[in-house]
Amino acid sequence: MENSRDTHFSANGRDYRLPSTPTVVVCVDGCQYQYLEAAAAAGVAPFIARLLAGASAFKGNCVIPSFTNPNNLSIVCGVPPVVHGICGNYFWDETANQGKGAEVMMNDPCYLRAGTLLAAAAEAGAAVAVITAKDKLRRLLGWQLQGICFSAETANTATLAENGVDQLLDLVGLPQPSVYSAELSEFVFAAGVRLAETRKLDLMYLSTTDYVQHKSAPGSVEANTFYAMMDRYLARLDQLGWAIGLTADHGMNAKHDPLSGEPNVIYLQDVLDRWLGSARARVILPITDPYVAHHGALGSYATIYLPEGGDTAAIIARLSTLDGIELVLDNPSACARFELPNDRVGDIVIISQKHVVLGSRREQHDLSGLTVPLRSHGGLSEQEVPLIFNRRIVGALPSDPLRNFDIFSLALNQLEPR
């Protein structure tokens, strides 16, 4: 920051220092800690290896459900979903369809109940840029932001009026990437580096896609290739003098039979239709988004709306006996435990075990896009995420365990200056 009397700003009850040195926070989609360790051990990610060994590297928790939207918004708001309101990629909106309700994507800023710290920093005078892989996040992350905000998915159509920057393919020097590719995330990193090289920025947020993580386990050739690419761009940002904080929105695990490769799925709507009658209950899968080739809308977290007068306790008890189920809670208990907005969560929250996913009806899931055995997320087993920095942390940590939405507080308030 230059020529500014302000040195701090606030957002959602948390105080932050305006960056005295350029600062970037990176959310690596689906990045469980083991991906970083494996790439470092293989010798393909020397910069990451240095951070893991000699800077500040922690294991923390993401928010539950361990999906993209609720965690990215928690990170950029600095608070859990009960405050900002985004509790899934997809939910049952009781106010939609003229009050009759409808299942909708949770991509519209109208669903946000809190402002982002990015917008607050920009309002306080910081030059801010946000780059996301998937366009579904762009409007949420960029809500009320005066600055640069674009997605790699639609980089070729970015305009000054809408995105604060144009001619991105020329600037970055890469072709428009496919949404189903590792190159989509590389474009995010490459664009971040080019902005750092060509603009006077104070704060950046980079958010990737988990295309590689859905297909490849830690230590695989494909995963290590991805992290080697990421390592080069992070090292360049470090060379340019940027403070770096890296976290993830969630981890990732195999969700298939190790012998057959078939997904391990509990089709909840089929189960409840047998128990209660056809379509009496409604199963919502908050992992649902337009990118079905990643996961086939199969994750380890679901919510259930029961018919009026339904016996919640009895259904919870019955669901708890199903093979592959880890946890079943009623709405008040789940929302208190996971800090979720009660009015956007069903009567029941259900979470499956590490290698099991939850579906709706079998015939409603198009799995033709799954070219490799299913890997997915959403449950408690994908809650652990990294928080790593290229400078040492000064002072006491803000929470124990750390949460991924502590990363801006750590990066702006507690990194040791160089």
Regions flagged by a language model, labelled:
Residues 1-56:
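Active-site-proximal N-terminal segment of extracellular/periplasmic enzymes that hydrolyze or transfer
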Residues 3-4, 76-217, 223, 294, ...:
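His/Asp/Glu-rich, glycine-adjacent segments
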Residues 28, 66-67, 91, 95-108, ...:
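Secreted, luminal/periplasmic, and some membrane-associated catalytic domains
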Residues 30-33, 65-66, 81, 135-138, ...:
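Short, solvent-exposed loop/turn segments at secondary-structure junctions
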Residues 36-83:
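Short, structured active-site-proximal loop/turn typified by the sulfatase FGly-forming signature C/S-X-P-X-R
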Residues 57, 127, 243:
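Residue-level detector of anion-binding/catalytic polar loops
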Residues 351-413:
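Low-complexity, glycine/alanine/valine/leucine- and proline-rich hydrophobic stretches
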